Amino acid sequence: MAEEKSTLGKIFTDWQVLIVLVLVILSVLSIYAIPPALDKGISGNLQLGLDLVGGSWIQLSFKSEVIGYESDMSQSDFITQLSEKLDADVIPVTSSSVEIREYYTKEELESVLAGMGAKLVTYEQGISKETADTVKGILEDKVNTLGTKDVQINTLTGANDVTKYVRVELAGTDINTAQEIVSSQGKFEIRIVTSGNETERVLSGDAVTSVSTPSQRNNYWGVGFTLSAEGAEALRDACIQYGAVTDPDSHNLVMLLDGEQVYSAPLSSDLAAKLSKGPVNDLSASTGYGEEGYNDAEVLEIHLRAGALPVDVEIAGSSSVTAERGEFIQIVCIAAAILGLLAVAFMVYYRYREPSIVVPMILVNLSEIIILLGIARYIQQLDLASIAGLIAVIGTGIDQLVVITDEVLHEGRVPSPSLYLKRFKRALGIITVSASTTIFAMLPLALMDLSTLKGFAIITILGVLIGVIFTRPAYGKIIMAILSKKPAK
């Protein structure tokens, strides 16, 4: 008994073992107590992906293209002319490339540029990385505004920095609701009537900087919003250019949301007078009267608060997992993990015939998984790929612990302390090289925006790092303390 207490004392006073214990405690607190989440069952605060709780994913493509061009004119003149000819927003990307925020085929653009005395050099359907970041932020704001939980939004950007797709994963959301939330993109624009039924684009939704709550004026519901300084200046210039300031009745201001008209009326005399003197930032979009008008105002507010997407999108792919199937997959994953640990325990015992090796090995492996989950809860949803990563961490972890055990043992006994430490350092060297290889192999998968194996790579890398830095050294000290009571060879 005294010998066992002495062994435990050696183990629990070693600083490397204490670090692992502290990390395990912090991880458990993170999963179940910060914030309190005991009512959520075994998953606690872990972020479960749609594979495990049910939900939907939607992949969107962009009705836009990034082109490279050659032209003798300045870029500002080129953009102005191209924007007028296409009636679309044209945004500079580099000194020789632009983003066109409407869909045109390569042949159509070659013809248009030829008419301008320019040449089309490259053509890529998609948007610039900067616009992609804007779209991602807008979608995140939109789904957060709607109260949707557990959302993952990732973009797929190629080596040429052109983003072709954005993928939205909404856990706990059915496919119809997901499509309504995501594909209803709130593309807002203001146009002005030039003559007859002809209109010209004035500005798009990214000029909207703030939005008020729905309010009633003269029994009509509407949403007030504020334009940026550039947007207000563009509105004033257009109203003066097309005569809306001097003849407002002939030049309605038209507001469109997703191509549908939500407001059309001439400038008020008060607004016309203000515009003649300077830019006006505060405007209002009327949505009608009664309950329908109020509901439309609420929808408009949501889209404007989230920010209107600068480009049109279309659904390129979608799928869903039912909540029942998600629960079934959770059960299968838990069962697989338990069976895996039991199988590992059996094989380790069969190899060493020594319970004092099996128990520490399994406990160290479990502590590694707990620490990994405690960290992953902040940075990674647990989907099937992530679960596969956890199982891989269990397997590679046991492999490395076996390497340590085989290296330090001599005929089942611990050698002298100096020889033990020498062999232990050699084992850690082997493990570190192996871990480095794994990390470098997984990095490309972890850095790919839309890779379905991204979760697998992230979990595997984290698990390997936790093992090499914390749990492997602790295991070495535990084994040394437990088996040191055996006679040295």
UniProtKB/Swiss-Prot annotation:
One Pfam family cited in the UniProt record for this chain: SecD_SecF_C
InterPro entries from the UniProt entry: SecD/SecF_arch_bac (IPR022813), SecD_arc (IPR024912), SecD_SecF_C (IPR048634)
Keywords: Cell membrane, Membrane, Protein transport, Translocation, Transmembrane, Transmembrane helix, Transport
Regions that span the bilayer: 17-37, 328-348, 356-376, 384-404, 428-448, 450-470
GO biological process: intracellular protein transmembrane transport; protein targeting
Subcellular location: Cell membrane
Topology class, membrane: Multi-pass membrane protein
Any one of the GO CC terms: plasma membrane
Subunit structure: Part of the protein translocation apparatus. Forms a complex with SecF.
Family from the record: Belongs to the SecD/SecF family. SecD subfamily.
HAMAP family (UniProt xref): SecD_A (MF_01463_A)
Name assigned to this protein: Protein-export membrane protein SecD
Native source species: Methanolacinia petrolearia (strain DSM 11571 / OCM 486 / SEBR 4847)
Phylogenetic placement of the source organism: Archaea, Methanobacteriati, Methanobacteriota, Stenosarchaea group, Methanomicrobia
